């Protein structure tokens, strides 16, 4: 290379050194030497074009604070809260004091290694692959913004995602139609009954069930237009996960059950001097106030316990998964199931929610068996 830049072998990486604004800048590069030379030429070109400047002294923690403030108005409250906790409790103590201009891929890779081996705050080992990827996603996004604003020359977290452990998706639990019926009977006289009914009958998410009002139900059609989320300061309504409302045609039995619940709820509220209206939440406390999402999550297992030790220990969110599985087993078209769930593509539905149960496997085996019988008969007839 020219005298303006040098490349030195450092272990299993290369150190690139070059001049920027009268100062020496360095970058650690992993890969082949010819690729390191290509990278150095690109850096020198950026310097010549004036696109680079002396590395900023702003620390990573200071930048994350600014970045999170910019993101607050554009991000769901619960997501912003999770980002803030990752920045403050995971990234900050480890590499938060490193200036942005000195944050290298090698330093971030070391941080990721520490996350995997001793990242838990309680000192009991490393973080899960999913949490490690949450940290990487946040860091990559924040540093990408810094690079676009020319605070740093490039995003040092860009190429590190491939080094993180893969997330192994567990088999999702699901109830079959018979089990779903038993669960509905168990919760019928409780305040969480309509939430369970909407999750099973319409495939709604937890927050969507808790945000639905009587004004959203017209005949047998429920408009899913918002969600109720839990934040550090309380609860808040927000748009659905995919950002737009959807219309779900309810099974007639589900719609009838909701109308019966509406009468019961009106009587409950009247005893407290409260008048039911179109804005009244379908799933609410006895005084008409919103149910806390976490309260629903914690209350739900109590009813499962009443169904005996052999009953599947599903989470509330698994009722949505059960809804899709039951619909698929009943022969409902995959695209229609996807639309009811509010997914952007059929692939998401097939990958995450459509879980073949034992009955479906047995039916598939029978169809294959019947096909082989036809083949055997055809061969016999030809003989």
Model-inferred region functions:
Residues 215-221, 332-352:
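Short, polar N-cap/turn motifs at the start of nucleic acid-interacting alpha helices
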Residues 125-129, 133-137, 148-212, 241-245, ...:
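Basic, Lys/Arg- and aromatic-enriched nucleic-acid-binding interface segment
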Residues 32, 166, 174, 227-230, ...:
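Catalytic-site neighborhood detector that most strongly recognizes the C-terminal catalytic loop/helix
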Residues 121-125, 182-193, 202, 248, ...:
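Short, basic (Lys/Arg/His-rich) helix/loop patches that form interaction surfaces
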Residues 1-3, 185, 230-254, 260, ...:
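C-terminal secondary-structure termini that scaffold catalytic or DNA-interacting sites
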Residues 4, 10, 86-90, 97-113, ...:
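N-terminal DNA-binding recognition helix of tyrosine site-specific recombinases/integrases
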Residues 8-110, 260-282, 286-289, 358, ...:
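N-terminal DNA-binding module of tyrosine recombinases/phage integrases
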Residues 60, 76-79, 83, 104, ...:
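Hydrophobic (often cysteine-bearing) scaffold residues that line and stabilize catalytic clefts
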């Amino acid at each position: 290379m020219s005298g303006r830049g040098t490349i030195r072998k450092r272990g299993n990486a290369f150190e690139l050194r070059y001049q920027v604004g009268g100062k020496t800048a360095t970058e650690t590069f992993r890969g082949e030497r010819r690729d390191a030379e290509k990278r150095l030429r690109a850096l020198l070109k950026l310097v010549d074009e004036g696109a680079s400047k002396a590395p900023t002294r702003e620390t990573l923690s200071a930048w994350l604070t600014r970045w999170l403030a910019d993101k607050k108005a554009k991000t769901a409250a619960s997501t912003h809260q999770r980002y803030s906790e990752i920045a403050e409790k995971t990234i900050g103590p480890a590499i938060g004091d490193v200036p942005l201009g000195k944050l290298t891929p090698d330093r971030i890779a070391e941080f990721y290694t520490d996350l995997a081996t001793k990242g838990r705050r309680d000192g009991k080992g490393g973080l899960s692959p999913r949490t490690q990827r949450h940290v990487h996603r946040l860091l990559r996004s924040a540093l990408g913004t810094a690079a676009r604003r020319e605070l740093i020359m490039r995003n040092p977290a860009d190429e590190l995602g491939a080094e993180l452990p893969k997330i192994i998706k567990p088999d999702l639990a699901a109830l079959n139609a018979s089990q779903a019926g038993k669960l509905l009977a168990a919760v019928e006289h409780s305040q969480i009954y309509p939430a369970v009914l909407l999750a099973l009958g319409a495939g709604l998410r937890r927050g969507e069930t808790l945000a639905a009002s009587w004004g959203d139900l017209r005949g047998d059609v429920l408009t899913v237009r918002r969600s109720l989320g839990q934040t550090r300061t309380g609860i808040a309504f927000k748009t659905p996960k995919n950002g737009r409302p959807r219309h779900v045609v309810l099974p007639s039995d589900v719609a009838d059950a909701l109308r019966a619940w509406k009468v019961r709820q009106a009587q409950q509220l009247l005893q407290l001097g409260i008048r039911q209206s179109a804005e009244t939440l379908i799933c609410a406390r006895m005084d008409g106030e919103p149910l806390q999402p976490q309260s629903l999550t914690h209350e739900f297992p109590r009813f499962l316990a009443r169904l005996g030790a052999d009953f599947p220990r599903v989470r509330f969110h698994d009722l949505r998964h059960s809804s899709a599985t039951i619909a698929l087993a009943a022969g409902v078209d995959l695209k229609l199931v996807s639309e009811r769930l509010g997914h952007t593509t059929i692939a998401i539905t097939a990958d995450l929610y459509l879980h073949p149960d034992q009955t479906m496997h047995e039916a598939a085996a029978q169809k294959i068996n019947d096909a082989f019988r036809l083949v055997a008969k055809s061969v016999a007839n030809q003989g």
